[in-house]
């Protein structure tokens, strides 16, 4: 049974390391490619009001701003938000930047958004289900929630492949202290049940359904273009979606 952490984890002290680790190589490129491909399929061809909850360094927001959408980035960690501001300035794009945790967003946002992004946030929260009603209020009735989260199933599978059987017996999956392993990996079935009161899941994809399981020497030899092509081609395959290190669910709010 998962023991909840005492507080949400913010990235003030880890911003630079986090950025380099996630976005410095193939892992980050695959993540962005899958999220962007999924969103391209559903978003209407008009400017949208977008809220990025836990926006981090703003990679996804910048992509959306570049497509003409009106973007608000909400991020509690000042170094991350500063990095996002610099990224937008370098690109010559405008956005609204809000330094606030998710608990304060309803008080700071006057009306709901056409698209709410919540990517790699839930797994760092002390009580992940608590954010769901807030996300529902922030999403317009005909809008979309783009929810990406760290998949507990994939973490278990990776530990099986590595022979970490003692860790599996103790169910010690969470990262601790300064670890960049999330403190609360999510069980997709449990989350689906919690989500049901607030959203219906319309589309599901796996993010990195095979890359992270490749032997290191094969990862090093593979061309990024080939990795992206194959990850995109297999992200919704029924045998592979659930192996994604992250799962991306596109959701509509329940009435």
Task: Please place each PLM-identified region on the residue numbering.
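Class I SAM-dependent methyltransferase SAM/SAH-binding core
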Residues: 51, 59-104
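A conserved beta-strand element that flanks and buttresses the S-adenosyl-L-methionine
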Residues: 117
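Short catalytic micro-motifs in class I SAM-dependent methyltransferases
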Residues: 120-121
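Conserved class I S-adenosyl-L-methionine
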Residues: 1-46, 59, 63, 80, 144-171
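Short alpha-helix
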Residues: 181-198, 204
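A short glycine-rich, Lys/Arg-flanked "PGG" loop and its adjoining helix->strand segment in the class I
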Residues: 129-144
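A C-terminal cap/extension of S-adenosyl-L-methionine-dependent methyltransferases
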Residues: 203-255
């Amino acid at each position: 049974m998962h023991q909840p952490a005492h507080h949400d984890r913010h990235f003030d002290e880890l911003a630079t390391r986090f950025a380099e680790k996630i976005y410095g190589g193939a892992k980050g490129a695959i993540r962005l490619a899958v999220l962007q491909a999924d969103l391209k399929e559903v978003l209407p061809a008009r400017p949208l009001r977008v809220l990025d909850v836990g926006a981090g360094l703003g990679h996804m927001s910048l992509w959306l701003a570049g497509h003409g959408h009106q973007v608000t980035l909400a991020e509690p960690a000042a170094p991350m938000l500063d990095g996002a501001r610099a990224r937008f300035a370098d690109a010559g794009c405008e956005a609204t930047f809000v330094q606030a945790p998710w608990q304060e967003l309803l008080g700071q946002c006057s009306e709901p958004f056409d698209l709410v992004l919540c990517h790699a946030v839930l797994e760092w929260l002390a009580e992940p289900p608590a954010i769901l009603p807030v996300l529902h209020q922030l999403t317009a009735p005909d809008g979309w929630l783009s929810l990406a989260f760290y998949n507990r199933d994939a973490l278990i599978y990776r530990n099986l492949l590595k022979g970490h059987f003692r860790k599996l017996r103790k169910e010690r999956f969470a990262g601790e202290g300064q670890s960049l392993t999330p403190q609360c990996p999510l069980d997709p079935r449990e989350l689906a049940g919690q989500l049901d009161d607030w959203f219906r899941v319309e589309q599901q994809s796996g993010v990195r359904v095979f890359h992270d399981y490749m032997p290191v020497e094969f990862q090093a030899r593979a061309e990024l273009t080939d990795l992206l092509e194959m990850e995109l081609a297999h992200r919704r395959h029924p045998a592979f979606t659930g192996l994604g290190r992250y799962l991306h669910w596109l959701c509509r709010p329940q009435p």
